[in-house]
């Protein structure tokens, strides 16, 4: 596979406390783009399940374009509020909107961060939860990440600065101990959970997850 990735961005100080950044990027992928281990399903009256499976088949090229706008406003006590919006579109006819809001608040050696992220996208032109027959279309996909979906992410993070600038250890100038928790909820609007029932009675798939991270950062 080959990939070409180009991007450009501009940052502007708007006021004493407000800074904004505008970014644009385009990515082109060529080659074998689908997962050889994924399958689509199609209606099959001869199967006890009512459907059978066959391999996915994706286009061999994909070009995406995205534009993003981010603004950061600095508050008293070294706190900051950041808002971001990103629009995405590609040649597979996926269109996505992502928005997020972040608040950062230092307190002594601690820094607290809270973030909310919202993402909504349409599905790829060749995505189907189930196809009407075998080889029904030129391209076929059932990857849930290609389906229409909406996701919500809530994040909390705390960092403790145990190594202050200019008081380092040898080559290390600064060090922090970090803990974060992300709560993720994804609704797939056209992707069924085939384990939840028989054909026609399946529930739409949902993903709920908590992601914990503990790590140490050093600057040198």
Question: For each of these PLM feature ranges, what is it?
Answer:
Residues 1-5, 9-13, 26-33, 113-161, ...:
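Outer-membrane beta-barrel translocator/channel fold
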Residues 6-8, 67-69, 99-101, 156, ...:
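Membrane-embedded beta-strands of outer-membrane beta-barrel proteins
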Residues 33-41, 94-99, 125-131, 189-198:
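Outer-membrane beta-barrel translocator domains and adjoining extracellular loop/strand segments
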Residues 156-158, 207-220:
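Outer-membrane beta-barrel "beta-signal"
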